[in-house]
Structure formats: C-alpha cells, structure tokens
Curated annotation (Swiss-Prot):
ATP binds at residues 65-72. NCBIfam families: PRK13505.1 (NF010030). One of its GO terms (molecular function) is formate-tetrahydrofolate ligase activity. Pathway: One-carbon metabolism; tetrahydrofolate interconversion. This is Formate--tetrahydrofolate ligase. It comes from the Bacteria. It comes from Methylobacterium radiotolerans (strain ATCC 27329 / DSM 1819 / JCM 2831 / NBRC 15690 / NCIMB 10815 / 0-1). Its EC number is 6.3.4.3. The keyword Nucleotide-binding applies. Disulfide bonds: none annotated. SUPFAM superfamilies: P-loop containing nucleoside triphosphate hydrolases. CDD domains: FTHFS.
Length: 557
C-alpha cells in the first residue's frame, strides 16, 4: 500500500466551499486559505448557538505504545463511516504541533485511507494559529519584563515570575535559561525557561474559551507573578489582554478542511494531553454539534489522560456530554502491554494478548465509571491473526460485557468502519445521562489528585512533595480550591513510570510540582519526570524530511 503522503497527494480534493455547502455554511462565512482550507467567521459561529446540538462521540484509546494505536485514524475513519451510512457527521480534531512532527511522532492527520487533507499544510504551518498563540504568549512575556524594567509599579518580585516563554519546537536546551544578561540596558537578570507552545496556558485558554469576550476575560485571569508581599499578579494587571486578544482574533475562528472522502473536519487548537488538557477547541466542538447530527472528536493519548480531562475539565466547563465513547485498541499494542518486544509483535501470541488485555479492561471500566456507553474499536493490522481478533472479542464480551469491533479504515477508508459506525449509532440512541465525574469540585485539591490516582490509575496513594503541597495550600487560600485538576504525567503507563505497562496496581503517584492555570480554570499537577518542554529523540523525524527535486515534501509521513 502507498505511504500516507502518497495517498494524500493522489486524492482529488473538493473546493472547500463545496465541503462547507454540505453543512449549509454560506460562502460569505468562510475566510479561505487557498482552495482547500477555510476559517469559519466568528459571526456565523455565534449564530449557530440557537440550533439544537447533535450527538457527541468521543474517541479515546488504551495507553499508547511505540506499536501505535491509530486513534486519529479511527476518528477520521469513523466520521467517514457515519457519513457513508447516512448520518451527517463532523469530525473535530486538534492541530498538530511542529515539535512532534520533527521529533518522534511525525505528522498527525490520520493515516492510510482515513486522513484529513491537505495533510502537509495541516501538519506544518496550517493557518498560523500556533504562530498567533506563540506570539500572544511572547507578547505577555515581553510586557511583564518591560513593566519590571520601567519602575515596576506593581512591585513584582522577579524571583516569583511564573510566566515562562514558549516555542513550538522540541528543544531541551531551553528548559532552563538565564535572561537579561549583558548590562543594565537589558533589564534585570533572572532565571527563566521555555515550554512548548502546546503547554502554554494561552493554548489552554484558547481551547476552552466560548468566544472572543470569554477569551479576553480568561486571559485577564492568568496569574503570571507574585509581588514582594506575595499578592498575585495577573495579565490584566500588566494590561496585556487587549493586545493578546487582537493577536488571537483570527486564530480563534475554527479551521474547516476535509477527509479523503470529502467529509468535513474542523481542526482547531492543540494542547497536549500529557502536559495539558489534550482536547480541541470548545468553539469547534460546539460548532460541529450544531452543524451536524454527529460530531466525532478525540482526546489525546490514553483514556487515563485525554478522556479524563475531556470529561472532568472540558465537558464540565462547556456543558457537553458524550452520547458514546469509542476506545481504540490494537492487537499489537495489547501484546506489547503483555510483555512482547516490539520486534516480535508480528508473531501470534494469545497469552500475551490476554495479559495485555488488562490495560484495555481498566480503560473501559474507568469510562463506564463516568456513566458512559462504550464500544471497543480494534484497529486492524496486516500481521494480526483471526485467532487473536476472536480472542479479544471473547475477552471483551465475557469480562467486560462490551462489544469489540474489528475496523479496517486504514486500508479501506470509511467502508472499513461501517460496523463500528452502526454500533455507535445504536449506543447513541438513549439520551445521555449526566457524567459521573471522578471528583467533586468542592473537594480539596489534594483529594482531587488522590481520586484520579486511586480511582483511575490503580494507585495505592499519592505522594506530594513539600513544595508542591505548600503551593496547593496557597492556591486554596487564594480562592482556587474549586478548580479541577489537570494531571501532567507520562502517557505510556497508568503509573508515573513509563516502563510499567499493562494495568499496574498499588503504586504511588508522586507529584513533584503544581501550577495554577487560573485563566484556563484548572490546577496542573506535574507527576514523575514529565517535562513541559520535550526534547528530540536520538534520531528525530527531521533527519529524513526534505524537499525532493520537484519541490515536494518527502519524509513527513
């Protein structure tokens, strides 16, 4: 089968106006970025709120492995399949970050015959949203240091400036820096550092804001420093929010593209799920629900991270409730969770599959704990055997009382996921019940962290370092105790040890730091060795990305 990029280039794309027409979006509501990408105007989006929303379908997955699960591919394939069986469906995805594109992961627009296109533009600069978010964040950083330089009327303590800088690249050398060296004219020297753009609170605010007014209000709430007498300083205090909103105005309009089968997809916002809340924008999701009968969206990494945050943060803030949840699994990944080395995954191994099934079982059980109907989508790989698929379906049926459906959308497009689509429609017929959240907002911040760790991760308890515990107490004293928790931890395990696969129990979840994201409306708990600025691997994907003799990109996929 051709590579993903070859398949994408061979596709005949519809003019974006034709894709919009399927949804009833008029030409004057589109801001075109070439022939195949458009932003949907703020005014048109606002006018959709009076419409009755359709059904929301969440796609999540088992704990990811290097063997790959294909969550985005399944999201796209399911959206195409729902359209094929006559259900008007919108797909809502996150925008890819440049860092992972050039690092370990490569592109992030689906794969095989279940892709969103134009793939190269989506994976690289797209419509410039990440540039706008990086610029707005950088403007705030410049205004903070400028305020300190010119008299410091707010009495900001330069030892307690919490606002780090960002860049949309994996660059470990920037994690800790010293700035303002070179003399008096350059300001006051202090320690600083960079995070990747997708970890910026501006990105989180961007993705949780309902509209421009809400965006500006949330930006104003962001706590960026403390004074010498330990009072909190916000972006509103340094008069940053108006100019930042101007930089983000056009970016906040969701991006409309299409699948290989010509179906609509909104791709907007892109916070990571291991160091942020991992969901596309509220604006895009709400627009999708009002433009289509079904909206299929994904949450990053495994259900312990992306889905939990989708339900406990995004749904809580935006008033959303999924009608059905698809948990993506592969035979290969489950065998890896069962102890098989990656180089041996092509061989049939029923025993390892059954052992690794514990990972899928915990994710499904956790999601049912939220009160949600679940179906398992088994992403088919050519080396899988019929016996392995039969065993997985048997395990799901007998141990979980859940249906597992083999999907071949990577090879066949939407036609390969029609059985999954019909199962989703069946699950979605009942009126969704209120979500049973992992914790109550009135609980103490420490108790919320403990609830996530013990209920969802299988931990015996949590261990919060002294400095982090003191910060949590301060957050509660300052009136932020009601906020939900955003866990920042490895995506590869239920624990904080990325090598502990399967479904570990009795471990301790260590919290080494916490950060207040008052604008986004959550508290980040940083666990284990997770970094908010990733590094590149020994052999980054960038090593093989180039332009060929015809000026086309080679190696992105």
């Amino acid at each position: 089968m051709p590579s993903d990029i070859e398949i994408a280039r061979a596709a005949t794309l519809k003019p974006i106006a034709q894709v919009a027409e399927k949804l009833g979006i008029p030409d004057d509501a589109l801001h075109n970025y070439g022939k195949h990408i458009a932003k949907i105007d703020h005014g048109y989006i606002a006018g959709l709120e009076s419409r009755k929303p359709g059904k929301l379908v969440l796609v999540t997955a088992i704990s990811p492995t290097p063997a790959g699960e294909g969550k985005t591919t399944t999201t796209v394939g399911l959206g195409d399949a729902l359209n094929r069986i006559g259900e008007k469906t919108m797909i809502c995805l996150r925008e890819p970050s440049l860092g992972p594109c050039f690092g370990m992961k490569g592109g992030a627009a689906g794969g095989g015959k279940a892709q969103v296109v134009p793939m190269e533009q989506i994976n690289l600069h797209f419509t410039g949203d990440f540039h706008a978010i990086t610029s707005a964040h950088s403007l705030a950083a410049a205004l903070i240091d400028n305020h300190v330089y010119w008299a410091n009327e707010l009495n900001i303590d330069v030892r307690r400036i919490h606002w780090r800088r960002v860049v949309d690249m994996n660059d470990r050398a920037l994690r800790a820096i010293t700035q303002s060296l070179g003399g008096v004219a350059n300001g006051f020297p202090r320690e600083d550092g960079f995070d990747i753009t997708v970890a910026s609170e501006v990105m989180a605010v961007f993705c949780l804001a309902k509209d421009l007014a809400d965006l500006e209000e949330r930006l104003g709430r962001i706590v960026i420093a403390e004074t010498r007498d330990r009072k909190l300083v916000t972006l509103k205090d340094v008069k940053a929010t108006g100019a930042m909103t101007v930089l983000l105005k056009d970016a906040l309009q969701p991006n409309l593209v299409q699948t290989l089968e010509g179906n609509p997809a909104l791709i907007h916002g892109g916070p990571f799920a291991n160091i942020a809340h991992g969901c596309n924008s509220v604006i895009a999701t709400r627009a999708g629900l009002r433009l289509a009968d079904y909206t299929v969206t994904e949450a990053g990494f495994g259900a312990d991270l992306g889905a939990e945050k989708f339900l406990d943060i995004k749904c809580r803030q935006a008033g959303l409730t999924p009608s059905a949840v698809v948990v993506v699994a592969t035979i290969r990944a489950l065998k890896m969770h069962g102890g098989v080395d990656k180089k041996n995954l092509g061989a049939e191994n029923i025993d390892a599959l059954e052992k690794g099934f514990a990972n899928l079982a915990r994710h499904v059980t956790n999601l049912r704990g939220f009160g949600l109907p679940v179906v398992v989508g088994v992403n088919h790989f050519h080396a899988d055997t019929e016996a392995e698929h039969a065993k997985l379906k048997e395990l799901c049926r007998e141990r979980l009382d859940v249906e597992a459906i083999t999907c071949r959308h990577w090879a066949e497009g939407g036609a390969g996921a029609e059985e999954l689509a019909r199962a989703v429609v069946k699950l979605s017929q009942a009126e969704p019940a209120p979500i049973r959240h992992a914790y109550e907002t009135e609980s103490r911040l420490t108790d919320k962290i403990r609830a996530i760790a013990t209920k969802l991760y299988g931990a015996a308890d949590i261990q919060i370092e002294t400095k982090a515990a003191g910060k949590l107490a301060t957050f509660e004293k300052d009136g932020y105790g009601h906020l939900p928790i955003c866990m920042a931890k490895t995506q590869y395990s239920f624990s904080t040890d990325p090598t502990l696969m399967g479904a570990p129990e009795g471990h301790i979840v260590g919290v080494r730091d916490v950060r207040l994201s008052a604008g986004a409306g959550f508290v980040v708990a940083i666990c284990g060795e997770i970094m908010t600025m990733p590094g590149l691997p020994r052999v980054p994907a960038a090593d093989t990305i180039r332009l060929d003799a015809n000026g086309q990109i080679d190696g992105l996929f």
